[in-house]
Amino acid sequence: MGKIFYIMGKSASGKDRIYSLLVENKELNLKKLILYTTRPIRAGEEEGVQYYFTDDRRLQAFEAAGKLIEARAYHTVHGIWTYFTADDGQVDLSEGNYLGIGTLESYEKLKAYYGAEYVIPIYIQVEDGERLQLSLIHISEPTRLA
């Protein structure tokens, strides 16, 4: 049986960069666990690559079908944006290993759903001063950290 390696860490800890490097390493043969979001797609993003972009109706359909694994809602100036993981058939642990990225809360829900023996946590810890510096670079030069 395969595993789900799940990357977590505070904002600006480098999670996305580490995720990208691991996915790009063909020797690891990791499949991507792609989350859903109700927020609008951003410039440079592609449907089914970073996220599946959807709406509240689909979120509710997953929930009604008992296929909603976890969901997190964020109150933004543009409204409520929800990020969620659903059992949509993309994960088949008999077919290999997966790589996901999220929060500690979403990790706990995935672990409860798939089982602790199948969900392996990877926590990225970076000193707060360095995270601040990375955040400032990201704001002023978004392509520099890519």
Whereabouts are the PLM-identified features?
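Single conserved hydrophobic/aromatic residue that forms the stacking wall/gate
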Residues: 137-146
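Post-Walker A helix-loop "phosphate-sensing" segment adjacent to the P-loop in P-loop NTPases
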Residues: 24-32
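Conserved phosphate-donor/acceptor-positioning beta-strand/loop module used by diverse small-molecule
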Residues: 99-103, 114-135
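ATP-dependent small-molecule kinase phosphotransfer cores
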Residues: 37-98, 102-104
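The conserved Walker
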Residues: 10-11
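Hydrophobic anchor at the beta1->P-loop junction of P-loop NTPases
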Residues: 7
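Walker A/P-loop
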Residues: 16
